[in-house]
Amino acid sequence: MARYIGPSCKLARREGADLSLKSPSRALDSKCKLEQRPGQHGAVRKSKLSDYASQLREKQKVKRIYGVLERQFRNYYKNASTKKGNTGENLLQLLETRLDNVIYRMGFAVTRPAARQLVSHRSVLVNGKMVNLPSYHVKPGDVVALSQRAQKYLCVQESLTIKDQHGSAFSWIEVDSEKFSGVFKALPDRADLPSDINEALIVELYSK
């Protein structure tokens, strides 16, 4: 299945949630009515979904937040289920260690799609070596940096400015904005991750 490249507002309306697909400096467009489904005459969202529908929607929401396709997501779940500990938390940790997500968390890109583009365009180094695979898993202790060329990009400069304005910092990541680099210190705890994600619903879905 091809990656979605249409309006981000449409995805947000489909899931009824802000998927962080737009810059934090721009609020969701006034036309992006999250209480309504996509379409010119989108029906008002039902207040109650079946258990299966709730589980499916949660999976779709998380896939769209992290920009992961169905087969990738299923593989992440299988990997998470074989690890020790809570499967749902393991799943979120795997998604958080994706290189495109780490670039986003470090503040070098305003959205995950923008971070994915930086990685794909060979603008990111991991431990001094160029990596152009967005799904590359960053390990604790890895040093992630932008190339000399990417450091001059206006979009990167603007992203760092927005990061400073919004004070977005994460305990498991240490960033040196002046050097355009950061260290992935450790896997994040569940308490450090988005509270609006209910990973238990995803586990219930795949456990059937």
Curated annotation (Swiss-Prot):
Residues of the S4 RNA-binding domain: 97-158
MF terms in GO: rRNA binding; structural constituent of ribosome
Domain of life: Bacteria
Keywords for the protein's UniProt record, in alphabetical order: Ribonucleoprotein, Ribosomal protein, RNA-binding, rRNA-binding
BP terms from Gene Ontology: ribosomal small subunit biogenesis; translation
Keyword RNA-binding applies: yes
One of the record's GO cellular component terms: small ribosomal subunit
Keyword Ribosomal protein: yes
Database matches in Pfam families: Ribosomal_S4 (PF00163), S4 (PF01479)
Function field: One of the primary rRNA binding proteins, it binds directly to 16S rRNA where it nucleates assembly of the body of the 30S subunit.
Family affiliation: Belongs to the universal ribosomal protein uS4 family.
Assembly notes: Part of the 30S ribosomal subunit. Contacts protein S5. The interaction surface between S4 and S5 is involved in control of translational fidelity.
Protein name: Small ribosomal subunit protein uS4
Organism: Xylella fastidiosa (strain Temecula1 / ATCC 700964)
